[in-house]
């Protein structure tokens, strides 16, 4: 066996005396803190929102609570293809599929439907991957942002609750 030649690629940056003692970093952090203090205390710009009297304004890209869409005839869009369940990194979605029988054919456009559809908001990380994976455009994260509750069962969304979050059935695409 021969010897291996090692070549040093990166050279180490020589720290100056003030970088060694972190005076520069401490001063930089104190300057940021001082700027925020001046804005809040002297200029009287408030940072805190008086919740629940005042509501926060959300951007158009805000990911709120999950909602399920219906098509133009008012039928459920979800065909229980399990795409959202498989792609969910937090494993927060549970779907149980059912076969469409003639009695409920008018409610579902396909042969299969979601008999049980649950999202556990305690596990959900609101990444939006379920929304992107849905081929039918059935699930969206455009619901309300306030989800505070004192009951853990309220944080498990069922299909029925997702369809009535914004005051009744939701028809059409995202605005």
Curated annotation (Swiss-Prot):
InterPro entries: 4Fe4S_Fe-S-bd (IPR017896), 4Fe4S_Fe_S_CS (IPR017900), NADH_quinone_OxRdtase_chainI (IPR010226). Residues 69-98, 115-144 form the 4Fe-4S ferredoxin-type domain. NDH-1 shuttles electrons from NADH, via FMN and iron-sulfur (Fe-S) centers, to quinones in the respiratory chain. The immediate electron acceptor for the enzyme in this species is believed to be ubiquinone. Couples the redox reaction to proton translocation (for every two electrons transferred, four hydrogen ions are translocated across the cytoplasmic membrane), and thus conserves the redox energy in a proton gradient. Its EC number is 7.1.1.-. The gene is nuoI. Gene3D superfamilies: 3.30.70.3270. It is an enzyme of class 7 (translocase). [4Fe-4S] cluster 1 binds at residues 78, 81, 84, 134. Binds 2 [4Fe-4S] clusters per subunit. Disulfide bonds: none annotated. HAMAP family: NDH1_NuoI. GO terms for biological process: aerobic respiration. SUPFAM superfamilies: 4Fe-4S ferredoxins. Belongs to the complex I 23 kDa subunit family. GO terms for cellular component: plasma membrane. It is found in: Cell inner membrane. One of its GO terms (molecular function) is NADH:ubiquinone reductase (non-electrogenic) activity. Pfam families: Fer4. It is a peripheral membrane protein. This is NADH-quinone oxidoreductase subunit I. NDH-1 is composed of 14 different subunits. Subunits NuoA, H, J, K, L, M, N constitute the membrane sector of the complex.
């Amino acid at each position: 066996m021969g010897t291996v030649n090692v070549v040093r690629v990166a050279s180490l940056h020589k720290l100056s005396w003030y970088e060694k003692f972190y005076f520069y970093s401490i001063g930089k952090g104190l300057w940021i803190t001082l700027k925020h203090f001046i804005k809040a205390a002297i200029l009287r710009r408030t940072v805190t929102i008086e919740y629940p009297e005042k509501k926060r304004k959300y951007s158009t890209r805000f990911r709120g609570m999950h909602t399920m869409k219906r098509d133009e005839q008012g039928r459920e869009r979800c065909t229980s293809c399990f795409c959202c369940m498989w792609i969910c990194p937090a494993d927060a979605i549970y779907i149980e599929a059912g076969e469409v029988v003639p009695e409920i054919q008018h409610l579902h456009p396909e042969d299969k439907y979601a008999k049980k559809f649950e999202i556990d908001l305690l596990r959900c990380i609101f990444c939006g991957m379920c929304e992107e994976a849905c081929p039918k455009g059935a699930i969206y994260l455009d619901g309300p942002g306030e989800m505070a509750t004192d009951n853990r069962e309220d944080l498990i969304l069922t299909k029925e609750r997702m369809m009535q979050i914004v005051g009744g059935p939701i028809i059409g695409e995202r605005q």
